[in-house]
Amino acid sequence: MLASIPTEHGLYLAAALFILGLIGVLVRRNLIFMLLSLEIMLNATGLAFIVAGARWGEAEGQIMFMLILTLAAAEAAVALALILLVYRRFGTLDADRLSRMRG
């Protein structure tokens, strides 16, 4: 299926998703939205690996995607636990407010 999609289109899509995720991390102040934006960035890099692997007919792109997927799952679990602790302690998920509380 990926053989019929031009490589450039897949890489453009991956770049667009990565940029959207980066904008989300930089613009949003809610920690959960920042985490979701980071997940979008990780999925964009995985898509780039899959497209590049499909271009040359190699399995390394899919292997790297599985590694990225595993890393994203572990990162999400740890980050959600930390976000829950921050919310219980400070009562907010706004990154600006948290940095002001720190002093």
UniProtKB/Swiss-Prot annotation:
Localization annotation: Cell inner membrane
Topology class, membrane: Multi-pass membrane protein
Main location: membrane
Class of this enzyme: translocase
A GO term from the CC aspect: NADH dehydrogenase complex
GO biological process: ATP synthesis coupled electron transport
Ranges annotated as spanning the membrane: 7-27, 31-51, 65-85
Catalytic activity, as annotated: a quinone + NADH + 5 H(+)(in) = a quinol + NAD(+) + 4 H(+)(out)
The entry's keywords: Cell inner membrane, Cell membrane, Membrane, NAD, Quinone, Translocase, Transmembrane, Transmembrane helix, Transport, Ubiquinone
Keyword Zinc found: no
Subunit structure: NDH-1 is composed of 14 different subunits. Subunits NuoA, H, J, K, L, M, N constitute the membrane sector of the complex.
Protein family (similarity comment): Belongs to the complex I subunit 4L family.
Function: NDH-1 shuttles electrons from NADH, via FMN and iron-sulfur (Fe-S) centers, to quinones in the respiratory chain. The immediate electron acceptor for the enzyme in this species is believed to be ubiquinone. Couples the redox reaction to proton translocation (for every two electrons transferred, four hydrogen ions are translocated across the cytoplasmic membrane), and thus conserves the redox energy in a proton gradient.
Name of this protein: NADH-quinone oxidoreductase subunit K
Recorded name of the encoding gene: nuoK
